[in-house]
Amino acid sequence: LPEGQQQHPPAPIGIPLGAHVIGGNRCEFRVWAPSHASVELHIVAPREQRIAMTRDAAGYHEAIVDDCGEGTRYTFVIDGRERADPASRLQPDGVHAASEVVAGDFEWNDKGWTGVALNDYVVYELHVGTFTEEGTFDAAIAKLDDLKELGITAVELLPVAQFPGTRNWGYDGTYVGAVQASYGGPRGLKRLVDACHQRGMALLLDVVYNHLGPEGNYLAEFGPYFTDRYRTPWGLALNFDGPRSDDVRWFFVHNALQWIDEFHIDGLRVDAVHAIVDHSAEPFLQDLCEAVHRRAAELGRRIYPIAESDLNDPRVITPIEEFGLGFDAQWADDYHHSLHTLLTGEQDGYYEGFPPLVSNLARVLKTGFLYTGQHSSYRGRKYGRAPKTNDGAKFVISMQNHDQVGNRLMGERTAALLPPEKVRLAAAATILAPFLPMLFMGEEYGEKAPFQYFTSHSDPDLIEAVRAGRREEFDDFLWQGEAPDPHDEETFRRSKLNWSLRSNAEHAAMWTLYRDLLTLRRNTPALRSLDLSRVETHADDEQRVLLVRRGDVLLAFNFSDEQRVVTLPFEGAWHSLIESQATIEAGEVTLPPSAFGVWQA
């Protein structure tokens, strides 16, 4: 570029960040701190040292230290302040303390692992801290055989980046590459990934690139990681399109590749991409997806970036070469909301725009979205655009997930809101839909414990601010009562799964139904096909009955509390594929209240 048009050297894309053991018991340290002329590396333990780092023209400070291996504790000193490494792999004493060097010498047992085809994904979303009594990666491993028997093919973890204290959903993480110490740290996560792969299951990780948590967040002291040009619901936005944003982008792309390279992660669920403000011609999210796909090709593995997006914008799941962002799939909340209102009748908050009509659910089954440009009463504007794809694998659906459960006033699960027959109806509709189904931990046996919002901050003012914020979140809803205190440890304890329920007859029957539905989905060619162009629907809003034909398979769902008899619009000699009270005779289907049936021609 002409002189004066390039103020800073280009970001050195590809260089490793943080601390790395490079052999011979030597460590390389690197941090981007362009706001500082000098940075000091402070080796805290086992032998204290202070080392002046070398700064390059782009603001990267580097040092190589002898006699330095795994377990070395260190900080960076900037303007006299001791700060943990922004690219730390481990924060053993929390977000305000020193970082620890982690070596890469882990004995993997997944040689030859290439991943799971996206079409075969049956996702199980879990929160490590409440999934088991121990709340660790190792304890989660003990449950994997149950998930395998159930029919799960991909485990998805809520964020595991280091957060304050030991109780958090994970979205308050402040060290994006440091694995939560209380869960078992980096080696614990590697053991869990390895165990999943040995059972033929993928492991997905929820990552947060739209904000950092409020406690232990010292990133702005190092450089222009944030911008004041935009705001997010959680504070300042990350700088993905301003001056020096190339380096900020690399910091987060580096993190994504770290999960893939060092932890053998099979996919990244990218949190709230709609909250990432970026007006670049080539957005950060495109860079991210491109980097993930390139690394997948290099490794010969199936690795998928999956978006959480409430934009109903098909560009999110459109390939980069077709001018999209390049995500392989996205969460589809329209499915959840359409199903939820049918089952509960709730119409407040964001459910306002989802009247309890079976025709709405039918529309979602054909396109993935309900809103494709219509006016949304809740949003007060036109919303969404029609996808151009007929690939149902582009959409991840659920009847409940951590958001939809945890962001209720009392954190009630579906099994606590509805009678068992309606839970079974919802499960069948979801598992047999032409999309990628996702279960929320415990739903497979009808867990009734709540999943509530919990934190363990150390700042009294922040604790009170979080309490007030939670109260404000429920202003649009008609729920009555006082929200549980996020800081109360009992809120966290109440949210743990009760695995002993599995031995109860009612809950065991629910688990068996889930297993049978997943087996049916897996073994029936018409249900394995996720081609939306082959989906035919017949919705009767008055009778609240939905008929769906997928190839040679017929599905019938009765969302009313009355028995319904409906004339079949589809011809065929139908035989039942699953035990059900629903029957077909003389061209009519009879459905008891809240019943479903599955037949094949």
Question: At which residue positions do the language-model features occur?
Answer:
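Glycan-recognition and catalytic regions of carbohydrate-active enzymes
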Residues: 13-15, 367-384, 439-440, 445-454, ...
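Substrate-binding/active-site clefts of carbohydrate-active enzymes
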Residues: 111-118, 127-298, 316
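Short edge beta-strand/loop segments characteristic of extracellular beta-sandwich folds
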Residues: 27-34, 557
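The feature marks proteins involved in alpha-glucan
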Residues: 1-28, 48-125, 130-135, 146, ...
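Surface-exposed beta-strand/loop patches in extracellular or lumenal glycoproteins
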Residues: 29, 39, 559-572
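Conserved, mostly hydrophobic/aromatic
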Residues: 31, 76, 126, 147, ...
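Conserved alpha/beta catalytic core and glycan-binding cleft of carbohydrate-active enzymes
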Residues: 285, 289-476
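C-terminal beta-strand-rich structural cap/linker in extracellular carbohydrate-active enzymes
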Residues: 33, 70-72, 586-601
